Design a protein with these regions (language model features):
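Beta-strand/loop-dominated core regions that host nucleotide or nucleotide-derived cofactor-binding catalytic loops
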Residues: 1-183, 197-200
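AAA+ P-loop ATPase motor domain of ring mechanoenzymes
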Residues: 2-19, 153-449
Length: 449
């Protein structure tokens, strides 16, 4: 057993990534040896202690799990704990009581609160373990709404049931930083693994590279068709590595006045260095760094020269990684594509069937799907669809479903009855009809109208 007993009642365990089926459900999957040591059974509650304290419901890992000694939790639980994947936390069994009162605060949106809404949220949270300061997700009409536990009585790990007095505040949390986790990215398993090694590791543990006497990668160029997840991958890397992110959009930063664009670039690189660890993400880099022999204006040539100067020398830039994204890698100036600048290039390609299934699971997570929908079969039909295409397809399928129900809905009434809303579902034919509307990105050049 590779588990590390902390004492007779707790274990030190490594954090692992949750699967799509567990996202937003406060589950922690652990192996049978860990269950035996902690004397817990599936469905019981465990306390998790990282930088902060949280809790989760125990579930068994899959039999074919490659890392049975890890505790698998979703991105929201990792945030509640203040940890990232591969960090070590303390795990122990905990006895919970029923919460007498709980106060929730919406994280991003201002909400209109009435008794019906409060009862709906309370019903969704019934049985879930919570503690003060946690953030939790509630699926409301297909959308995930996040709440922060503002107050809980008694002050310990508790569960919500019918007797709990639940209060929901209408004002949102003011200091919310939007967080995208690895569970929000589908179809890029191998790419995420590689990017974590070359981006997240140097940002979190630069001492590893100092000890070995080598410099980590200073820049990574992501290339591939539009909508495959290049920007999303950059955002999730910044979030999971607790790095500050500075975005530069190629066409937007260009300025016709002499020296303005170069000054903007210098300011962004300086700010990133002052607030390191940082990730600078340059989207559509071919717009600001085209091949100099193919452009006639001095502005583009000066900008390329400035970018080359800024990217030279890791020690001068500090703990900063530069990510560039383009769907035209051959249009980028070759001087940028050499060691010391963008010294690694990674293709973010159109997802395969397994990748499309992952993406479908993400975008249909809150959708009421009919029983005739088998996501694996649907994914096999979506050849050539990128992540953005699948997101658009799911939205279009929902619109098709709404059109089917419109004759039964009284649009003049102030509110649509909750019974009517609960009966709505999306059928397989809605997806098939939507496939005529959403043309896959990878097939557009072959598409005949």
């Amino acid at each position: 057993m590779n588990l590390l007993p902390q004492n007779k009642e707790s274990l030190q365990m490594c954090i692992g990534e949750a699967k799509q089926r567990d996202v937003g459900k406060k589950r922690a999957r652990i192996g049978p040896e860990a269950m035996d040591f902690l004397h817990v059974a599936p469905g019981e509650i465990i306390q998790l202690k990282g930088k902060r304290l949280s809790c989760a419901i125990v579930w068994p890992i899959d039999e074919d799990e490659k890392n049975p000694d890890a505790v698998k939790v979703d991105g929201q639980t990792r945030k509640n704990l203040g940890v990232s994947i591969n960090d070590i936390i303390e795990v122990q069994k905990v006895d919970t009581k029923i919460a007498k009162s709980v106060v929730l605060m919406p994280v991003t949106d201002v909400v209109t609160v009435d008794q019906e809404f409060t009862d709906f949220v309370k019903n969704r949270l019934k049985g879930l373990p919570i503690t003060d300061g946690d953030e939790i997700s509630v699926m409301i009409l297909g959308n995930s709404m996040e709440f922060r536990i503002s107050k809980v009585s008694p002050k310990r790990i508790v569960r919500i049931d019918r007797s709990t007095n639940l209060k929901i505040l209408s004002e949102a949390v003011s200091d919310k930083k939007i967080r995208i986790t690895y569970e929000e990215v589908g179809g890029l398993v191998s790419e995420i693994k590689s990017m974590r090694e070359i981006v997240e590791l140097p940002l979190k543990h630069p001492e590893l590279f100092s000890r070995l006497g080598v410099e980590p990668h200073s820049g990574i160029l992501l290339y591939g068709p539009p909508g495959c997840g290049k920007t999303l991958l950059a955002k999730v890397l910044a979030t999971e590595s607790d790095a500050n992110m500075y975005s530069i959009n190629g066409p937007e930063i260009m300025n016709k006045y002499y020296g303005e664009t170069e000054a903007k670039l210098r300011d962004i690189f300086k700010e990133a260095k002052d607030n390191s660890p940082s990730i600078i993400f340059i989207d559509e880099i071919d717009a600001i760094a085209p091949k100099r022999e193919e452009v006639y204006g001095d502005v583009e040539k000066r900008v390329v020269a400035q970018l080359l100067a800024l990217m030279d020398g890791l020690t001068e830039r500090g703990n900063v990684v530069v990510l560039g994204a383009t769907n035209r890698p051959d249009s980028v100036d070759p001087a940028l594509r050499r060691p010391g600048r963008f010294d690694r290039e990674m293709e973010i390609s159109v997802p395969n069937a397994d990748g499309r299934l992952e993406i479908l699971q993400i975008h249909t997570r809150g959708m009421p799907l009919a029983k005739d929908i088998e996501l694996k079969n649907l994914a096999s039909e979506l050849h050539g669809y990128t992540g953005a295409d699948i997101k658009a397809l799911c939205r279009e399928a929902a619109i098709k479903a709404i059109r089917r129900y419109l004759p039964e809905i009284d649009l003049e009434s102030e509110r649509i009855p909750s019974k009517m809303l609960q009966s709505m579902e999306i059928k397989l034919r809605d997806f098939h009809d939507s496939m005529h509307e959403v043309v896959p990105t990878a097939m557009r050049e072959f598409y005949v109208e």
